[in-house]
């Protein structure tokens, strides 16, 4: 059984950019992958953390992890945009072999639970 590979891209944003701009970067890179034909599996903001060593005179950075599948063409488009952005101070994309990560369950999300309950209600009504 061959499992399809997927990609994990971790990038670090400058710590001094405002929260609205961080959100715009999250949506910009996610939309860029979707337009290039990739499926975005997960997009997690890891928050502001201290760097192991200074990068461009920054001691902290905002970490973001993006899991997606597709071919290498989407990765090239994404990395080119990150390389040209002044707000991204580091990025790394790793090709993962193995099972896809389970989707995150966001607390308080009702739409995911609703479809599971409906078939049970329909089967009870039919009996």
From Swiss-Prot:
Gene Ontology MF terms in the entry: small ribosomal subunit rRNA binding; structural constituent of ribosome
Pfam families linked to this entry: Ribosomal_S6 (PF01250)
Signal peptide segment: none
Keyword Membrane: no
Region (Disordered): 99-127
Keywords, alphabetical: Ribonucleoprotein, Ribosomal protein, RNA-binding, rRNA-binding
Gene Ontology BP, a term: translation
Organism: Parasynechococcus marenigrum (strain WH8102)
Protein's name in the database: Small ribosomal subunit protein bS6
Domain of life: Bacteria
């Amino acid at each position: 059984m061959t499992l399809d590979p997927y990609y994990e891209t971790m990038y670090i944003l400058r710590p001094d950019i405002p929260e609205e701009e961080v959100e715009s970067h999250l949506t910009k890179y996610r939309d860029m992958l979707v337009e290039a034909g990739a499926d975005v599996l997960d997009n997690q903001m890891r928050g502001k953390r201290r760097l192991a060593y200074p990068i461009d005179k920054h001691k902290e950075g905002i970490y973001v992890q993006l899991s997606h599948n597709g071919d290498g063409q989407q990765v090239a488009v994404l990395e080119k945009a990150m390389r040209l952005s002044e707000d991204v101070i580091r990025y790394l994309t790793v090709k993962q072999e193995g099972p896809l990560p389970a989707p995150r369950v966001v607390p308080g999300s009702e739409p995911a639970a609703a479809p599971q309950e409906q078939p049970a209600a329909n089967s009870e009504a039919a009996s």
